[in-house]
Amino acid sequence: MVNKCGKELRILLDLDKFLTLKNAKIFVFSSLARNFVLSLRQNKKCMKYPLGVQSFGSIRNDGYLYIDKTALVYQIANGGKYYFLSRPRRFGKSLLISTLEAYFLGKKDLFRGLAIDQLEKEWKEYPTLKLSLNVANYTSAKVLNDVLNDATNSWCTQYGITVNGETPSLRFKNLIIALYKKTGSKVVVLVDEYDKPLLQSLDDRELLSQIRGDLKAFYGILKPMDEYVQFGFFTGVTKFSKVSVFSDLNNLTDIAMDQRYVELCGITENEIRTCLDSQVGEMAEANGMSKDECYERLKKTYDGYHFEADTVGIYNPYSLLNALSSKAFKDYWFETGTPSYLIEQLKRTNYPLTNLGTEEITADVLGNIDTIDQSPIPMLYQSGYLTLRSYDKEFEMYHLAFPNLEVERGFTRFLIPYYTQLRSDQGQLFVANFVKELRAGKVEAFMKRLESLFADGDYQVTGNAEFYFQNVVWVIFKMIGFYTEVERHTSDGRIDMIVKTSDYFYILEFKLDKSADEALQQIDDKQYAKPFENDSRHIYKIGVNFSTKTKRIDGWKIAE
């Protein structure tokens, strides 16, 4: 069900239902009402995209687009006690929490016409405590305690209750008991962005330990409270294991990789074709392409998230709706920011960027984040920068890759100032000049530009110089945007790369602590150019040597 035109549409739907329940004599009028409703639904001026709107009530009352997820909401609400769901940022977690809140508060009118309207018969109201930790910058443990105390005070005011307790966790416990005694109903607890305080303290072990302890105590009071609690749901970007704040809540059901709920957040292609087909058509027209071409480009740019093996692809809802609203293909998700802790973890662990897109990992490692010093892959996956591409059943290994073009392009662009001497505002221009030189066959200008990236040999170089060189080359050539093939052998530091343009082939061999002549010789010895000999495009062979001592390119040669 798509809610498009607000109160007017809902009034017409109610009128249509009423008239239909009467007699056949007014069927014609009822049909006219239906046709008018359909015309409203097709009217592009009626479409209101819920960009930045996270309140289920606002979406339903104010006529915003809503793609019906309530059948899954009903299944969750009536199928278990405590749930945990991790999804990338801007993926609809807050809206899901708001939807659950409306359901448990018994707000039946908000769900009229949705799937749950036919499933729920009782619509019982429960005292509901919703907590969002996305409201502060957690620079100290006191900030967290203040947020928890403020939330408890707000709940007490909302329900007319006074509770005591020396700590937020004790006050939380006493509030739940008091609510149960006052209302006679069990309490619902909904927590959004549970992990924000943890993520903001990753680089401060002492603060991380304090915050972990406080959250563990706060959530831990739910374990012995079964007789007072009806339901609990926690969302976040990441799942922590050894630093878990849920270790005392051992009956928490993790549905992050549950096939039944992969469509709970985000939008599927079927939902787009069912609910947004006319809007895709409008976007296609605005961009001078066919509707099929527009679907294909939307899929390539924003689809591709998989939260379990062999499941339907999920579109990033924030990016998709922004694209349809503005009728432009842009990297909307990255405009909202990329957490710097991800880049710091990549650099801290000397992670070879050439491995991105080829990683394989087991489910137990993938679903848990232990420390800030471990592999960055679980964090990259849970944060939405990598997704499941395939699954090896025999060895129970997942193959990870970038989900779509927006993430691959945006993530690589974001890396430039962290791995090169370029500022963030210089990177795109630098890459554009690279591309122009390659297209024009200006190979010497291209190589001088590449060489200049390493001119300051001490710039942000930490740890293994070989990884530094490989990572810089990977970032730049990834940004160039052509078909690029990279082979890396850590035993001798070799990188083979082929770049193709409409008029040229560039075959590059990179060496470490050897010579440009040796690199060129290997291109000939390995016959890298042989597959392209019958192609009309001009072939350039380029040998490059990088010095781990000076951390610069100390020689390059070109052959044709």
Regions found by a protein language model. Name each.
Residues 25-465:
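Phosphate-binding site recognition
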Residues 473, 497-512, 526:
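Conserved catalytic cores of phosphodiester-cleaving nucleases, focusing on short active-site segments
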Residues 9-15, 19, 27, 32:
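Short hydrophobic targeting helices and cationic amphipathic motifs
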Residues 218-225, 378-386, 474-479, 522-542:
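Metal-dependent nuclease catalytic cores in nucleic-acid-processing enzymes
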Residues 208-213, 512-529:
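Mg2+/Mn2+-dependent nuclease catalytic core
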Residues 452-485:
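Acidic-basic catalytic patches of nuclease active cores, encompassing PD-(D/E)XK
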Residues 531, 535-560:
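Domain-level recognition of nuclease-like catalytic cores that cleave nucleotide substrates
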Residues 179-183, 476-502:
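Active-site metal-binding core of divalent-cation-utilizing nuclease and nuclease-like domains
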